[in-house]
């Protein structure tokens, strides 16, 4: 299909040549008015012809004069065209690069005039929370990559200032539990529902049961995938046969528990009991344990049951192989042999699927020295993203009423979140964002391999707080680009006479060299926002935030007592109606 001719685009550049043609008609008129019969005579008296022709300012419309005007305009147009084709392309003062540091006017279109409706990036730069600004060109996702070495202030200069904005629901990874203590009272003061999951001290934690969020067969597969990705089995290194076999068994058992067990038994404790009951006799292939009998009974009722189909595939393994699979499953679920962990996963209090309904603060406290139970944090994030995306699509027409921000401190230490590279690209439209906080970009690459670049690419904002990891410094150096600078050289030659020389030239220089990045001032940071020049700015001064006075940093009396908060029991009111259930005999 041919594109329609753009008349406007064709006419506008040629309008000046119309005036040239009209003016050039005077040349033809002057030649005609000049006295003389031949060329030499007319050339001799040409000035008289010009005087006669320019007695009137109007162009001549004599046919000969019009031909002269058109010819002159065409010649000039041709000359301009030829010169343009052969023109040299100069970029004055940009010969070796155009990199520069950002200025206030560069960030201005991306900032919401209302301070609390922004993501705090640096002391002078912010990013509006709205995903649909008036000017679509300024729309950016709220995913942020924060990189900074130990002690660079990732929590103080980024996580806590953004928590104090109070414009969203927050899910905060909290190494050591300090953020919850310092900010918990602020959240309660502003009407937030506060939830705590503590993998360091289970006695100071709400309960979390992954089984509570299983609503379909695909939810079972997602849970098993997360469990496999973040726990260690006993299979042979480099052989994924054992993982696939374990996946079949986990899927079958969890499917059975979800569809057949009473609600109070749908938890990891029941799963452990199932695995413990799976006795295998290598010398008797016909032996059936209690789990075999349970599935046999289910198959008699529902031959095409999801759990039955998975279990039949598992039972294809010979006795010795099945025993190895069971051992591998037992090793993977060994942490659940701890009574405290079994108890904390008996039922659910986190209500992950409600984070987008009302303002909630969920603090995920984990150890920064021992990763034994960090797989639970990864499991929470995996279920959280999937639950909120599904609820946004199925209930709210694609967008959650309350934005959910995940501030994932020590992102590399919580384990792998399956399909994070896809989630980072799709959660924006559902009013969800993720801030990945790392000590070095190499941590992300070690965990997510080839998908790390995709994850980084889906973060429109990135902040470097300082560090000395070579890979991070090299990538940042390349991303900042080169600027063009002026240099001069002086020379002196001595002989019979002394002569001096001075030469000026232009060179390309890195906007920030690797050694400059390595010794970055502790109070400075580098912000990169997609489509905007990078900013060399001060880190945010947390003491200047309007809500700082409500943190325990400002006043120790504002410290949030987690144990006291969790021990609070409901006090019934006289005018309220409650449902009472009989738990039965224990």
Please state what every model-predicted region is.
Residues 424-526:
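Conserved ATP-driven motor cores of ASCE-family P-loop NTPases powering translocation/secretion/packaging/pilus
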Residues 128-133, 232-241, 263, 486-506:
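Low-complexity, polar-biased intrinsically disordered regions enriched in Pro/Ser/Thr/Gly
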Residues 99, 126, 142-143, 309, ...:
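General secondary-structure edge motif
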Residues 109, 115, 375, 411, ...:
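A short glycine-/small-residue-rich loop at the edge of a beta-strand within enzyme catalytic domains
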Residues 23-29, 137-432, 447, 515-539, ...:
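P-loop NTPase motor domains
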Residues 1-152, 156-159, 203, 482, ...:
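Basic- and hydrophobic-enriched, low-structure N-terminal and domain-boundary segments
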Residues 115-121, 375-383, 476:
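Conserved long hydrophobic alpha-helices within structured protein cores
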């Amino acid at each position: 299909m041919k594109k329609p001719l753009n008349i406007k685009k064709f006419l506008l550049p040629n309008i000046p040549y119309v005036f040239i043609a009209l003016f050039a008609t005077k040349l033809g008129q002057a030649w005609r008015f000049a006295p003389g019969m031949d060329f030499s005579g007319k050339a001799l008296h040409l000035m008289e012809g010009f005087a006669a022709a320019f007695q009137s300012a109007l162009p001549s419309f004599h046919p000969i004069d019009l031909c002269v005007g058109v010819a002159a305009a065409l010649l000039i147009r041709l000359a301009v065209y030829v010169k343009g084709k052969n023109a040299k392309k100069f970029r004055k003062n940009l010969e070796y690069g155009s990199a520069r540091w950002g200025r206030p006017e560069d960030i201005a279109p991306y900032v919401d005039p209302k301070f609390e409706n922004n993501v705090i990036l640096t002391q002078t730069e912010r990013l509006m929370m709205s995903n649909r600004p008036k000017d679509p060109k300024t729309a950016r996702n709220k995913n942020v990559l924060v990189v900074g070495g130990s002690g660079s202030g990732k929590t103080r200069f980024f996580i806590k200032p953004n928590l104090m904005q109070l414009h969203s629901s927050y899910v905060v990874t909290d190494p050591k539990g300090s953020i919850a203590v310092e900010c918990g009272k602020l959240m309660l003061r502003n009407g937030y529902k506060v939830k705590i999951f503590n993998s360091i001290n289970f006695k100071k934690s709400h309960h979390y049961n992954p089984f509570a969020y299983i609503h379909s067969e695909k939810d079972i597969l997602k849970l098993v995938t997360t469990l496999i990705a973040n726990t260690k089995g006993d299979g042979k290194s480099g052989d994924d046969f054992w993982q696939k076999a374990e996946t079949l068994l986990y899927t079958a058992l969890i499917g059975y528990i979800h569809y057949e067990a009473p609600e109070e038994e749908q938890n990891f404790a029941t799963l452990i009991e199932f695995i413990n009951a799976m006795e295998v006799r290598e010398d008797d292939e016909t032996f059936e344990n209690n789990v075999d009998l349970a599935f046999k009974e289910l198959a008699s009722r529902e031959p095409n049951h999801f759990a039955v189909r998975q279990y039949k595939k598992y039972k294809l393994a010979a006795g010795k192989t099945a025993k190895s699979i069971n051992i591998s499953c037992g090793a993977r679920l060994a942490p659940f042999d701890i009574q405290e962990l079994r108890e904390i996963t008996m039922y659910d209090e986190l209500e992950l699927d409600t984070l987008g309904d009302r303002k909630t603060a969920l603090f995920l406290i984990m150890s920064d020295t021992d990763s034994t139970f960090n797989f639970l944090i990864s499991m929470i994030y995996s279920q959280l993203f999937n639950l909120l995306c599904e609820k946004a699509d199925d209930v709210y027409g694609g967008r959650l009423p309350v934005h959910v921000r995940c501030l994932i401190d020590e992102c590399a230490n919580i384990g792998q979140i399956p399909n994070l590279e896809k989630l980072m690209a799709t959660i924006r439209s559902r009013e969800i964002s993720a801030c990945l906080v790392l000590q070095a970009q190499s941590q992300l690459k070690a965990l997510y391999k080839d998908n790390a670049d995709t994850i980084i690419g889906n973060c429109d904002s990135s902040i470097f707080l300082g560090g000395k990891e070579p890979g991070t410094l090299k990538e940042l150096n390349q991303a900042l680009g080169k600027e063009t600078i002026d240099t001069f050289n002086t020379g002196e030659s001595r002989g019979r006479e002394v002569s001096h020389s001075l030469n000026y030239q232009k060179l390309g220089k890195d906007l920030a060299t690797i050694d400059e990045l390595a010794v970055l001032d502790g109070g400075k940071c580098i912000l990169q926002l997609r489509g905007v020049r990078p900013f060399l700015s001060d880190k945010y001064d947390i003491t200047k935030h309007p809500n700082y006075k409500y943190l325990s940093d400002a006043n120790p009396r504002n410290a949030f007592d987690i144990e006291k908060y969790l021990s609070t029991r409901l006090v019934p009111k006289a005018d309220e109606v409650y449902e009472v259930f009989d738990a039965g005999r224990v």
